[in-house]
């Protein structure tokens, strides 16, 4: 097929981030300069974000057989780019105290962003696999970036081995689907699945194996065992990327697959996904109750958040509101996670050994960093789904979609899970206002609010509050991205 200027405009974010990767690579080869490479990375990601406006003017189109650029792709590309930008911003002060190679961090984040953008635009199982590998491989290096620390290295090895196993399941599942349907394109799969083929054992086995592979990447129960260890072992800025960009991109492509190929029409698939969602919500929240490490706590809570999103995915066949629910929920989850991990990153910067991730490190934070404590409180309330925050709007949408699709047992799980979640989120919030210990351990810089990371954290808190009270701009944006059939 011929590539026209229109196609090139549609691919602008991908091309800009790809070009930034090359420029940063050459810059590192030419001369090591931490500030220069960080600046180049941030400029590239900002340019890719701005280019989405031009992509919107070009309209929806199939750029290649592997990729479709439309409102849906633009929304998820934007969320991935925002998460990558925040990761680079949080990483800069952290890397200032890091004695080994600093510049490669940005290179790995950019390559992973490239994978996220590819996933957001994927319209074919080959693009799905390429995107997942492109996002996973840099993460192996990023998770083990503080490799002189035993915990970081252990987390990296764990994630690498388990990720390789999950990828093999995913690939084998795709092979079985291809063997039965003779197609890998989402659209063609949808057509071939239309005539009662979903009862074929080979096809069900293929989708089952794909659910195993994707369930690992999304850290859904029972494929979640790596999550708390990796979140705790990885540097705080990397945990930010892992919790946001990686999950959002992969969930976006799963959403598109389910939209084109009506896999959810199969009762067997719906039951399996329902059990996974139920287990993820209940188990994720129960395990978070006993955590005293804030990164482990956020790791377990991310399992339950993906469980809530799975409820909307199961309800996808019952109306377009599901897509809207997922878009709003993911935006709320992104800003809340950026704020929470941003506070941990600020407290842990510059690099001086292990991160400030113990709950004890945050005890009495309000008495010497009141604004930072207020930001953390807002993020915890949003993740818990308290009214007047963006997290509540997302959770309300998920409940509405569940009720609309008559998924009563999953609606009950969401309500019970939210009640359990309220306890441990408030436990973190309350500890910020207790009496500070005599000898505080780690602390954020005095003028943290004037640093780039501090500004990102404050903007996240502001968006969570403003969009929680007045969500219409976000809902309108998500509705624009919804019609893609």
Swiss-Prot record:
It comes from the Bacteria. One of its GO terms (molecular function) is NADH dehydrogenase (ubiquinone) activity. GO terms for biological process: ATP synthesis coupled electron transport. Its EC number is 7.1.1.-. It catalyses: a quinone + NADH + 5 H(+)(in) = a quinol + NAD(+) + 4 H(+)(out). HAMAP family: NDH1_NuoN_1. NDH-1 is composed of 13 different subunits. Subunits NuoA, H, J, K, L, M, N constitute the membrane sector of the complex. This is NADH-quinone oxidoreductase subunit N. It comes from Salmonella arizonae (strain ATCC BAA-731 / CDC346-86 / RSK2980).
